[in-house]
């Protein structure tokens, strides 16, 4: 009825229109929501597709194996489209806000906590931390296109305060002491937060420099050619920068700095040319400094400080020590300028350093001492640091160009330096003596050339002052005379007059006796060398000396060397892993100075290249294989050839001595390496059981129990609840856990029954008259639990070891008497033969021990037997019947009351354990058959 009345209701036009509008609005809203959803879905799909394309591009880059200089990255621009951007582009620095960084410069005031220095260091740390987190291509984009980064690094390397460089003031001594006290560490002034932030800045700058020196990382790499041009053209690394890096970080990260400098010079050889130009610039500044000082009538100490003389010397010394290959440019620059003429100001860095060392610094030092009363304090503060650094510069040059060359010729080692060329011995000695002559003559040339330009004051100074000889001071520190003697002994072409002149110059004059001794060395050196060569090459050692002297050539060979064992032992006391020959070479290089050798071994970077490349475990000269330790096989062959008894005895003694000496050497080497012998304990075969740990067999584990526990277990066996306790405790008194732990080794001892029977049979003839029955009682209880179907006296071992017992009864027959052999064979026979042979044993016992026979057999009746299963009861009853049949002729000898039986049970249960404690450790420590000498008699007693 209601449905029929609805059409009759008429809506007004207005209501109808509103209704339609609402319906239309709902449709529009639904369509809008659907469109928005569809739009979002489409946008997400597009983004996902673009991200997939970006990931695919990254995978292709990794698979292509191209450097970042040849690859690009897909980027979504502002319009939502993909756009290609090179991996090295300004986009990553300027246009991208995510990777934008702007650095501020480091000022000298930032070394101290003043004003805004703390805030500026915080900004620097935050920018450096974000830079180090960037990917490889973004990091390199900042290095190339971000100028603020390069300006920051340059300012930091220039103005950051050095920690190890001694800043010397030639004007005031108080400032010297203050500066030296402040140079012990990087930061000492300021609060803790400021010092920590400054140390963090110091580390992060170094990490940035190290990353700039790396050509390859996990996230990418740069091709070698592009990288070499990149760092050189963009001036990411320059020679002044490298000098500053070495002076700042060489004392903190020496190995990292050496690898960084070496890799930079290897990738870009143009830096060698720049290094030569840099040395020429240093020599020019020293020339100008000398001219400005000599033209004045006053000692301008401030001018000497403002020209950074100490800074130049310190940086040069540190750089050459870190990078010895740079000494080639320094030495070549010196030789080039000497050819042009040293007096015109082009003498090279080495010439000007000798001039300042011998004349300028002593003049200023002397006048400064006159001006102040503290003469003692001024001398070390001004003169000594410069002296040490200048001498170190000359030592690195001598070592790299001459000393190492000579060692390489002697040891036949290939030259590791790429720039060095192999030179003969004559050329090495000629260059070295010419260098010494030029060093001594250059200062005189400068003094003669500048005589007209000097002021009257300096003319007086040069006339009155006594110059310091740089070679004499070098002799006091590095022992130049040892190297000169070595050259003279090896090379006969050296002029002896020049040798005596330089020896007198360094304070080592050659006497007339030494001259007479020295002259034959020139001729004998070559003959000795050639004789050694001929003797080593020929199979027989009986070559005539005339043949050896025919080939006279200045060739080096492995001469017989006498090693200083005392100094070698001193070095090996701190470094026991080193070989004698390696330590000998180190002592030879450092002029037999043990302290220098130890310091060099502590810092491996200070070792010369030929010692680094040498095997440190060498104990003898590798070039002389004939001098090895004789093996015993060579001496044993001599014994077979000889017929006389005397000869044979001597030959045999030599073999024993060589073998004993070789064994003693092996023992001493093993004792030095304690860790090797100690680690052998923890191999796979190591057993941590009680038997291995204690040294006793597991069968003797009962003696580790206390006597109180043994008495408790014996009392429990005699109580009325014995039948209920046997399932939980074994017949030997152990718990199930102990029986499980100790049951495994018992199966591994199949000869246990025979050993115990041997002891029982010996005790019948040697020991007391009541020991054997007590041991038989202890053997019976553990036999019922594992195998209840066997008789208690037939087989003391489990059923698994019947076969090895049948195969091994013949071993003790040769060492023991015939009576114990019969007793051994009884428990090892098969069960069918055992009932016939078993009554023989109690008959023997009754004959020898008729009075004490009833004691051991009484406890067998009250002792309970395990009843783990009802099926075993019939077998146990059969065993009891067999035992009673065996004991029938002995039953009339047992008329004793029950109280005596209980006392005897307790005594008998205690006595076998005491005898067991005394008897059983001995067979475990001795080999088989050792009981034949009566080893168990003492234990039975």
Swiss-Prot record:
InterPro entries: ASCC2 (IPR052586), ASCC2_CUE (IPR041800), CUE (IPR003892), UBA-like_sf (IPR009060). GO terms for cellular component: nucleus. Residues 16-64 form a coiled coil. The lineage of its organism: Eukaryota, Amoebozoa, Evosea, Eumycetozoa, Dictyostelia. SUPFAM superfamilies: UBA-like. Enhances NF-kappa-B, SRF and AP1 transactivation. Involved in activation of the ribosome quality control (RQC) pathway, a pathway that degrades nascent peptide chains during problematic translation. Keywords: Coiled coil, Nucleus, Transcription, Transcription regulation. One of its GO terms (biological process) is rescue of stalled ribosome. Residues 712-726, 915-927 have a biased composition (Basic and acidic residues). Gene3D superfamilies: DNA helicase RuvA subunit, C-terminal domain. The keyword Transcription applies. One of its GO terms (molecular function) is ubiquitin binding. It comes from Dictyostelium discoideum. This is Activating signal cointegrator 1 complex subunit 2 homolog. Its main location: nucleus. Residues 563-606 form the CUE domain. Belongs to the ASCC2 family. Residues 856-869 have a biased composition (Pro residues). It is found in: Nucleus. Residues 531-551, 630-659, 762-855, 870-914 have a biased composition (Low complexity). Residues 531-553, 612-665, 695-941 are annotated as: Disordered. Residues 616-629, 727-751 have a biased composition (Polar residues).
């Amino acid at each position: 009825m209601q449905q029929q009345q609805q059409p009759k209701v008429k809506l007004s036009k207005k209501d109808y229109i509103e209704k339609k509008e609402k319906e239309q609005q709902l449709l529009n809203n639904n369509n809008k929501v659907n469109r928005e959803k569809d739009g979002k879905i489409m946008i997400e799909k597009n983004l996902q597709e673009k991200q997939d394309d970006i990931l695919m591009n990254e995978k292709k880059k990794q698979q292509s194996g191209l450097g970042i200089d040849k690859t690009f990255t897909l980027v979504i621009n502002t319009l939502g489209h993909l756009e290609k951007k090179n991996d090295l582009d300004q986009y990553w620095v300027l246009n991208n806000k995510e990777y934008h960084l702007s650095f501020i410069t480091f000022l000298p005031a930032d070394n101290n906590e003043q004003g805004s220095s703390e805030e500026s260091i915080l900004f620097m740390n935050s920018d450096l931390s974000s830079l180090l987190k960037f990917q490889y291509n973004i990091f390199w984009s900042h290095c190339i296109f971000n100028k603020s980064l390069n300006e920051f690094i340059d300012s930091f390397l220039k103005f950051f305060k050095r920690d190890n460089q001694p800043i010397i003031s030639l004007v005031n001594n108080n400032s010297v002491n203050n500066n030296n006290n402040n140079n012990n560490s990087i930061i000492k002034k300021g609060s803790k937060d400021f010092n920590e932030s400054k140390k963090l800045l110091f580390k992060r700058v170094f990490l940035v420099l190290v990353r700039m020196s790396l050509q390859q990382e996990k996230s990418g790499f740069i091709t070698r050619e592009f990288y070499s041009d990149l760092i050189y053209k963009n001036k990411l690394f320059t020679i002044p920068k490298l000098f500053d890096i070495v002076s700042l970080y060489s004392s903190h990260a020496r190995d990292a700095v050496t690898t960084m400098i070496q890799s930079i010079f290897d990738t870009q050889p143009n830096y060698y040319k720049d290094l030569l130009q840099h040395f020429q610039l240093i020599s020019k500044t020293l020339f100008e400094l000398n001219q400005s000082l000599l033209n004045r009538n006053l000692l301008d100490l401030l001018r000497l400080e403002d020209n950074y003389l100490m800074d130049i010397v310190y940086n040069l010394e540190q750089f050459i020590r870190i990078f010895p290959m740079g000494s080639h440019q320094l030495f070549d620059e010196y030789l080039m300028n000497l050819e042009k003429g040293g007096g015109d100001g082009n003498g090279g860095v080495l010439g000007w350093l000798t001039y300042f060392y011998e004349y300028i610094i002593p003049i200023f030092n002397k006048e400064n001492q006159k001006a102040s009363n503290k003469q003692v304090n001024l001398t070390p503060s001004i003169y000594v640091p410069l002296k040490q650094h200048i001498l170190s510069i000359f030592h690195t040059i001598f070592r790299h160009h001459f000393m190492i060359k000579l060692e390489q010729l002697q040891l036949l080692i290939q030259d590791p330096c790429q720039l060095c060329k192999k030179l003969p011995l004559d050329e090495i000695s000629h260059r070295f003596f010419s260098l010494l002559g030029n060093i001594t003559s250059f200062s005189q040339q400068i003094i003669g050339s500048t005589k007209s330009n000097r002021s009257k004051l300096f003319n007086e100074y040069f006339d009155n002052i006594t110059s310091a000889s740089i070679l004499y001071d070098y002799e006091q520190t590095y022992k130049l005379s040892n190297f000169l003697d070595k050259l003279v002994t090896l090379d006969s072409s050296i002029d002896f007059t020049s040798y005596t002149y330089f020896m007198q110059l360094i304070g080592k004059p050659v006497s007339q006796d030494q001259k007479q001794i020295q002259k034959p060395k020139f001729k004998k050196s070559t003959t000795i060398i050639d004789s050694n060569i001929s003797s080593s090459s020929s199979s027989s050692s009986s070559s005539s000396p005339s043949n050896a002297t025919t080939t006279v050539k200045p060739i080096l060979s492995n001469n017989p060397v006498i090693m200083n064992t005392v100094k070698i032992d001193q070095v090996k006391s701190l470094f026991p892993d080193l070989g004698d020959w390696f330590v000998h070479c180190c002592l030879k290089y450092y002029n037999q100075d043990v302290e220098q050798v130890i310091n060099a071994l502590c810092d491996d970077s200070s070792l010369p290249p030929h010692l680094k490349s040498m095997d440190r475990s060498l104990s003898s000269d590798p070039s002389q294989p004939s001098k090895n330790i004789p093996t015993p096989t060579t001496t044993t062959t001599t014994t077979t050839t000889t017929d006389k008894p005397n000869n044979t005895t001597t030959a045999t003694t030599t073999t024993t001595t060589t073998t004993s000496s070789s064994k003693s050497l092996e023992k001493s080497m093993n004792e030095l390496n304690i860790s090797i012998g100690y680690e052998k304990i923890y191999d796979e075969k190591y057993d941590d059981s009680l038997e291995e740990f204690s040294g006793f067999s597991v069968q003797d584990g009962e003696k580790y129990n206390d006597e109180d526990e043994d008495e408790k277990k014996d009392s429990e066996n005699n109580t009325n609840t014995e039948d209920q306790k046997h399932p939980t405790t074994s017949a030997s008194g152990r718990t199930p856990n102990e029986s499980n732990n100790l049951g495994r080794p018992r199966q591994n001892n199949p000869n246990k029954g025979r050993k115990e029977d041997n002891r029982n049979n010996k005790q019948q003839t040697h020991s007391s008259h009541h020991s054997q029955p007590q041991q038989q009682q202890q053997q019976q209880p553990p036999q019922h639990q594992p195998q209840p179907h066997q008789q208690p006296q037939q087989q003391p071992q489990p059923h698994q070891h019947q076969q090895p017992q049948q195969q091994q009864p013949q071993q003790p027959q040769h060492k023991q008497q015939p009576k114990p052999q019969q007793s051994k064979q009884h428990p090892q026979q098969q069960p069918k033969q055992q009932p016939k042979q078993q009554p023989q044993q109690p008959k023997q016992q009754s004959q020898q021990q008729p009075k004490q026979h009833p004691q051991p057999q009484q406890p067998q009746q009250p002792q309970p037997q395990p009843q783990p299963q009802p099926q075993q009861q019939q077998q146990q009853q059969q065993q009891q019947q067999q035992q009673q049949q065996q004991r029938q002729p002995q039953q009339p000898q047992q008329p004793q009351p029950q109280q005596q039986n209980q006392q005897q049970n307790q005594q008998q249960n205690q006595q076998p354990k005491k005898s067991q404690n005394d008897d059983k450790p001995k067979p475990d420590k001795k080999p088989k058959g050792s009981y034949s000498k009566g080893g168990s008699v003492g234990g039975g007693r």
